């Protein structure tokens, strides 16, 4: 065969015209089949991508339960979030997994309680060092980085073909090796190890130290920008650009605004509007109101871009907060407490879910849910298999969203073996909390005191029923202790140098 010469067909030697036409006749359908196969693969992939829901998760920092028009505020103006509530489901009893940021954020990303993760305080704060008085307990050591071994919701979605972006606050680590790009996100814009931006206007430089005894940590949230640029707007610019770029593939947008965390900084024009507006009984800070309005405009821009691109019907929007609002800045009335403690004002948060074609517009839900639930819920929304060994403390709230059944869960739990330290009114001291039905029990580790409240009758937690209802108190206390043992939480220890006198 290697010695055969090539002979031109014109010489009449070799394949005759009939044979050649026959072979070409066989060859053409083969080409057609290959082209058809390629088209089917391409279209199949496109249809598969087209069939997947996009997920937009908007997390606001330190937004209180009543900081929105749809949650009762007559001072703060939030027309875009209010519209979102009218188009979806609004939850009255939604909870953050902690009264401070890092633990709640870790719970959202992993589906696990902060106590189980051992991420129980705002990284890297050691609250006891901020308190000048002697303390009866040595606060528990907690992890300063979300372990890479945890399979985050971003990693699970990535395995399913999603492209994902973390925009804004991260704050579940101290070391760079644990930033969003190492936890499943394809894009990280402005996420680092700090809990606030230092500045809301470019340049976004910041410096912080835990106490005067500690050296300053300095950072720059976003090195590039233009003078006068406002961080909430910049993150929104990045978010809509991400949506535009990935409009033809399924995406997960984790839009985690630094607002409305301190420092209080907002656009002068919006501040001026609220300075002219009569304050209400509970809300009266013009700068904070202006920050909330900028967040609301951000939501409006994201929704508008989805509408413009024809993505509204295939995009879920989840809107919530990581804990209650700052007690020196906003009011949580009728709730007791604020960010930094475990009364309702510190942990009850706004939650709105818009899921076109599934969630009935203007629907309400009073069933207690918590931030560990987002992981399994998003998987269920996306039609993906649950990962119960990962999101062990979460429950899918899809049955609630569809209004076809309740979720099976005995209770919600919180664990905080630390001290908040200075800065927040009524700052938490080491404690654990359980809510079961309408009942809520708080156990304080310093003096073993138990507080019992019926939230249905006493939303403001003004009447402690522990002494008058010992059986209910002990029932919940037993459950709380059993959960702590199962979750293997870390506990504070007695301070051997403490003298109660």
Segments and roles (model prediction):
Residues 121-163, 171-251, 257-259, 263-266, ...:
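Formylglycine-dependent
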Residues 51-56, 87-92, 160-165, 184-186, ...:
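Loop/turn elements at helix/coil->beta-strand transitions in domains of secreted/extracellular proteins
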Residues 73-78, 95-100, 126, 140-151, ...:
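A short beta-strand-to-alpha-helix junction
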Residues 76, 176-184, 262-268, 304-358, ...:
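Histidine-centered active-site microenvironments of extracellular/periplasmic hydrolases
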Residues 186-187, 191-197, 325-330, 337-344, ...:
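C-terminal cap/loop subdomain of S1 sulfatases and analogous C-terminal strand-loop tails that border
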Residues 11, 15-26, 49-53, 60, ...:
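Long, internal low-complexity/basic segments
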Residues 74-106, 111-116, 163-165, 186-192:
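Short, structured active-site-proximal loop/turn typified by the sulfatase FGly-forming signature C/S-X-P-X-R
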Residues 236-246, 272-314:
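A long, amphipathic alpha-helix that forms part
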């Amino acid at each position: 065969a290697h010695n055969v010469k090539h002979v031109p067909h014109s010489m009449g030697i070799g394949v005759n015209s009939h044979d050649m036409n026959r072979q070409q006749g066989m060859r053409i359908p083969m080409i057609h089949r290959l082209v058809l196969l390629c088209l089917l693969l391409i279209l199949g992939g496109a249809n598969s991508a087209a069939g997947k829901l996009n997920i937009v998760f908007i997390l606001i920092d330190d937004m209180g339960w009543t900081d929105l028009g749809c949650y009762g505020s007559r001072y703060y103006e939030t027309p875009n979030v209010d519209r979102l509530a009218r188009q979806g489901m609004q939850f009255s009893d939604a909870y953050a997994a902690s009264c401070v940021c890092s633990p709640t954020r870790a719970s959202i990303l992993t589906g696990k309680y902060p106590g189980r993760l051992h991420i129980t305080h705002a990284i890297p704060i050691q609250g006891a060092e901020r308190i000048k008085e002697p303390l009866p307990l040595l606060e528990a050591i907690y992890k300063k980085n979300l372990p890479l071994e945890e399979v985050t919701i971003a990693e699970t979605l990535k395995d399913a073909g999603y492209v994902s972006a973390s925009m804004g606050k991260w704050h579940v680590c101290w070391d760079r090796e644990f930033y969003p790009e190492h936890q499943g996100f394809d894009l990280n814009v402005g996420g680092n190890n700090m809990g606030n931006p230092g500045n809301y206007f470019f340049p976004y430089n910041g410096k912080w130290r835990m106490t005067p005894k500690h050296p300053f940590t300095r950072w720059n949230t976003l090195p590039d920008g233009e003078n006068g640029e406002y961080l909430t707007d910049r993150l929104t610019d990045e978010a809509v650009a991400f949506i535009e770029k990935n409009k033809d593939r399924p995406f997960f947008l984790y839009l985690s605004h630094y607002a409305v965390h301190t420092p209080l900084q907002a656009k002068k024009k919006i501040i001026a509007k609220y300075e002219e507006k009569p304050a209400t009984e509970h809300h009266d800070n013009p700068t904070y109101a202006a920050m909330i309005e900028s967040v609301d405009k951000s939501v409006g821009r994201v929704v508008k871009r989805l509408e413009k691109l024809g993505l509204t019907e295939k995009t879920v929007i989840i809107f919530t907060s990581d804990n209650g609002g700052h007690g020196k800045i906003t009011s949580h009335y009728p709730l007791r407490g604020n960010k930094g403690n475990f009364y309702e004002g510190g942990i009850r948060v706004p939650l709105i879910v818009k899921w076109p074609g599934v969630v009935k517009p203007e629907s309400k839900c009073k069933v207690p849910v918590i931030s560990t639930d987002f992981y399994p819920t998003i998987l269920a929304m996306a039609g993906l298999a649950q990962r119960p060994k990962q999101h062990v403390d979460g429950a899918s709230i899809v049955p609630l969203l569809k209004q076809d059944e309740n979720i099976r869960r005995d209770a919600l739990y919180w664990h905080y073996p630390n001290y908040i330290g200075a800065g927040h009114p009524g700052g938490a001291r080491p404690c654990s909390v359980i809510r079961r039905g309408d009942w809520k029990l708080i156990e304080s580790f310093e003096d073993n005191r138990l507080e019992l409240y019926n939230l249905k009758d006493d939303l403001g937690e003004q009447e402690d029923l522990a002494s008058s209802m010992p059986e209910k108190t002990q029932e919940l206390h037993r459950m709380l202790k059993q959960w702590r043992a199962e979750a293997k939480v870390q506990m504070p220890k007695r301070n051997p140098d403490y003298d109660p006198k």
